[in-house]
Amino acid sequence: MIISAASDYRAAAQRILPPFLFHYMDGGAYSEYTLHRNVEDLSEVALRQRILKNMSDLSLETTLFNEKLSMPVALGPVGLCGMYARRGEVQAAKAADAHGIPFTLSTVSVCPIEEVAPAIKRPMWFQLYVLRDRGFMRNALERAKAAGCSTLVFTVDMPTPGARYRDAHSGMSGPNAAMRRYLQAVTHPQWAWDVGLNGRPHDLGNISAYLGKPTGLEDYIGWLGNNFDPSISWKDLEWIRDFWDGPMVIKGILDPEDARDAVRFGADGIVVSNHGGRQLDGVLSSARALPAIADAVKGDIAILADSGIRNGLDVVRMIALGADTVLLGRAFLYALATAGQAGVANLLNLIEKEMKVAMTLTGAKSISEITQDSLVQGLGKELPAALAPMAKGNAA
């Protein structure tokens, strides 16, 4: 199969993976309206083509939290990467490290902090959920600090799990889920051999280390379901801000007032995100939410964005809408499931090439030159409601 875009990796991953795993990463909440709009709204953002600008000295490099990035992209936190490729978190981290961008380890990773951090030269980022078990949160933070993690990404848009109908249909949850997953695994031999057998242990490493016993998929679902905390408020985050002495990023912002609260709280960054359309269906796409948030806090706090980003053109669009850096989620997971570290490395190369083309043809020699002026007036900043119908194609 010829791979020329992230969509090719998605098609390949669907063939390789058991359905319960493919649909777990590919699906969203409820009817998946927001999930589809993430991609469609971003694709409708029109860039201004400019010509004869002498683009010979183009550079994608940028700086974030005193870290030099080869391009304004990081691999965002994605749970269960180690179920998509053998020791998947390590493979993805190595690809990011080689490309000169950050890798973010999820709380619910298969590979624990202590396995991933030593595998790369660059300090990784660590993502943490708001959980009832504050002992686990403190333990995870202590381990992340000890491993040299540079930035904490604190996810706040999950006080309760979203309702994901695809999971019940695919076997990730629902009646006879364990048996359905087993039958799917044995009929997908490439995955069964590479990950199912040779990718063990399939513990949730960060949770197992705390609980002192193995935690499989059923344990993961049960433990997390019992530990999400709907009572959380900004005040509950104060001890984390005091404990963590590195940059702290609040992930899950869609409203300008919440962005202002993050500035008042003292966060170093925010992620404009709807959790890839996996939490509340019907909320704004990140592309629609981003311009108003940038108007409210640009310059006061670092603005990251995710959800719907599939290629280098999308990266340029998000930056023009107001982001400083973007996070990749599904895009790199498709590549990881298809070809491991090599797949992620190739995806990052594709994104870099696509960014260079977009910047060359819009007259932006550097990341700082990608601004609202790079957008066609009326299509980028405002994103009117009639701009994009609900998507019928790929997930966000």
Swiss-Prot record:
Its EC number is 1.1.-.-. It is a peripheral membrane protein. Signal peptide: none annotated. It is an enzyme of class 1 (oxidoreductase). One of its GO terms (cellular component) is plasma membrane. Residues 1-380 form the FMN hydroxy acid dehydrogenase domain. Its cofactor is FMN. SUPFAM superfamilies: FMN-linked oxidoreductases. It is found in: Cell inner membrane. Keywords: Cell inner membrane, Cell membrane, Flavoprotein, FMN, Membrane, Oxidoreductase. It catalyses: (S)-lactate + A = pyruvate + AH2. GO terms for molecular function: FMN binding; L-lactate dehydrogenase activity. Substrate binds at Y24, Y129, R164, R278. NCBIfam families: L_lactate_LldD, PRK11197.1. Belongs to the FMN-dependent alpha-hydroxy acid dehydrogenase family. Catalyzes the conversion of L-lactate to pyruvate. Is coupled to the respiratory chain. This is L-lactate dehydrogenase.
